[in-house]
Regions:
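Short glycine-rich anion-binding loops that position phosphate/pyrophosphate groups of nucleotides
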Residues: 14-15, 72-75
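An anion/phosphate-binding loop that grips the pyrophosphate of nucleotide cofactors and donors
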Residues: 64
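Proline/glycine-rich low-complexity loops and linkers
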Residues: 52, 79-142
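Structural motif
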Residues: 47-58
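Generic recognition of short, well-ordered alpha-helical segments
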Residues: 20-24, 55, 80
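Glycine-rich phosphate/diphosphate-binding loop of Rossmann-like nucleotide-binding domains
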Residues: 2-43, 48
């Protein structure tokens, strides 16, 4: 029998920690994984604090086969996922051409010009690959 993958899920956000936002994303991710014969072995929710995120993600990276991180990709100051990944990879944040193109296309579809906050979303750890996002302004990061 093949070894079961150790899949860990890191949910982020002060709004989730406070209960202002109900975490429906974990259930959706678990259902999609389950439909493919996979299960989550650990799920943790962390507030928008760089040190807490670094600590938890570093631990998961050491112990999991796969880490899925949800949240923290938006344009606000407390969206820290790209910065956390850059620090853990010891890589600088750089303008990612594909992320920038996706962001500009998202703004154009809405008849908006990107503002300074939006432009933050084109900054990814050097060497990162994007996961296209058909709904939002920020891509996922692989």
């Amino acid at each position: 029998m093949p070894k079961q993958l150790n899949i860990q899920l890191l949910m982020t956000g002060n709004e989730v920690m406070s209960g202002d936002t109900i975490d429906t994303n974990s259930a959706h991710i678990a259902q999609v994984l389950g439909a493919n014969g996979l299960t989550i072995t650990r799920r943790v929710t962390v507030n928008d604090d760089i040190n807490h995120l670094l600590s938890e993600l570093s631990d998961m990276a050491r112990t999991a086969d796969i880490v899925i991180m949800n949240g923290g990709l938006g344009p606000t100051i407390d969206d820290l996922t790209a910065e956390v990944l850059a620090r853990l990879a010891d890589e600088p944040l750089v303008i990612h051409p594909e992320a920038e193109a996706q962001l500009l296309a998202w703004c154009e579809r809405r008849g908006q010009r990107p503002n300074e906050a939006n432009l933050k979303q084109r900054l990814l750890p050097r060497g990162a690959q994007i996961i296209p996002n058909a709904r939002g302004s920020a891509p996922g990061i692989d």
